[in-house]
Regions:
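Ribokinase/PfkB-type carbohydrate-kinase core domain
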Residues: 1-38, 42, 49-281, 300-304, ...
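Short glycine/threonine-rich catalytic loop with a Thr-x-Gly-x-Asp
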Residues: 276-294
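Solvent-exposed, amphipathic alpha-helical segments
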Residues: 289-297, 301, 314-321
Length: 337
């Protein structure tokens, strides 16, 4: 892909309307200054003094952050937060981002806000060191009233969205946004509007998902197909092509240091190698940047290979951003085209 083609595609980004349906969480970073360590008089244990707190949307919010960085015109998060302090912070963080519309984002007292609290030891001249993470999650099934509200929102957005991203981040099925009931609604939407790009990603795998575009890693592809855990690139290509033909939708597979692979229902397959490393890396957020960039590129009319190239560059940019869940702007990506 040459620079002019890249510019032509990304020039369409401000016109796109993209919905993100999934589990939004609050990423809260607590920056600890080890030089200010004290000892608790009550317990005798070390006290870590937090000198800075920063928060940003995480999980599905990480995809949203990437869409914002890419300059997407209208971004509609479909999910929920609790009626709590973390929910207030999450809504405030979402609302502050360009292009984000909270018309379909539910705040409810029936759920708590999904939160990742990440203590970081920060010292001058050194990379931040992350300590044990503190998570707040929902462990009970998502109430039917909340599910119905979310499904109604998805149906409304499907009428004129350019793309829908499904992001299932929870560890326990039926406790988040992407429930069996919501997936049934997605199946109806996909059948009613087959030209609509719907791309799905789930940390628990995509088994049982309707026929939409799949994005997964190699281990998830193995689990989905019952194949061996360690596969060659050629074996992954065959499996991805088979799944794409069976579902009638594209399949994308992230291959870590081997790059990205995509397969179309027609049998077309493309593999784009990863960019060389340019220093220390942090892979957190890499997969979400791939999801965001594949979606935007495809919605703008990019070919299979073009979308993979743009996503591979974005992923490379993100993994070189340390101490945060990074994003890649159009300018960042353009530098490597």
């Amino acid at each position: 892909m040459n620079r002019q083609r890249f510019n032509d595609l990304t020039a369409l980004y401000p016109r796109l309307r993209i919905a993100i349906v999934g589990d939004f969480c609050l990423d809260r970073y607590l920056e600890i200054d080890p030089a200010r360590e004290e000892t608790s008089l009550e317990t005798g244990l070390p006290v870590f003094n937090v000198v800075n707190v920063r928060s940003q949307p995480g999980a599905a919010g990480t995809i949203l952050n990437n869409l914002v960085a890419l300059g997407i015109g209208e971004i509609f998060p479909v999910g929920f937060c609790g009626d709590d302090g973390e929910g207030f912070e999450l809504r405030r963080a979402l609302q502050a981002r360009a292009g984000v519309k909270l018309d379909y984002f539910l705040q409810t007292g029936e759920r708590r806000t999904f939160t990742y609290c990440k203590p970081l030891v920060v010292e001058p001249g050194r990379e931040p060191v992350e300590l044990n993470r503190l998570d707040s999650k929902n462990w009970t099934p998502t109430p039917a009233s909340v599910q119905d509200h979310l499904i109604k929102s998805v149906r409304a957005l499907a009428e004129n969205a350019d793309a829908i991203i499904l992001m299932d981040q929870v560890d326990v099925a039926e406790t988040g946004v992407v429930t069996a009931k919501l997936l049934a609604a997605i199946a109806e939407i996909a059948a009613k509007r087959p030209s609509l790009l719907i791309i799905a990603d789930s940390r628990r795998g995509l088994k049982g998902y309707p026929a939409v575009t799949f994005k997964m890693n190699a281990a998830e592809l193995s689990a989905l197909t019952g194949a061996a855990e360690k596969l060659t690139t050629e074996e992954i290509e065959l499996l991805a092509r088979s799944v794409a033909r069976r579902h009638g939708r594209a399949v994308f597979v992230t291959l870590a240091e081997r790059g990205l692979l995509g397969a179309m229902p027609t049998g077309q397959v493309a593999h784009v190698p990863a960019l060389p490393l340019r220093g220390p890396i942090d892979i957190v957020g890499a997969g979400d940047s791939v999801t965001a960039n594949l979606t935007c590129a495809l919605a703008a009319g990019a070919s299979l290979r073009e979308s993979l190239e743009m996503a591979a560059i974005a992923s490379s940019v993100v993994i070189h951003q340390l101490g945060t869940t990074g994003v890649a702007t159009v300018a960042d990506i353009s530098a490597f085209v």
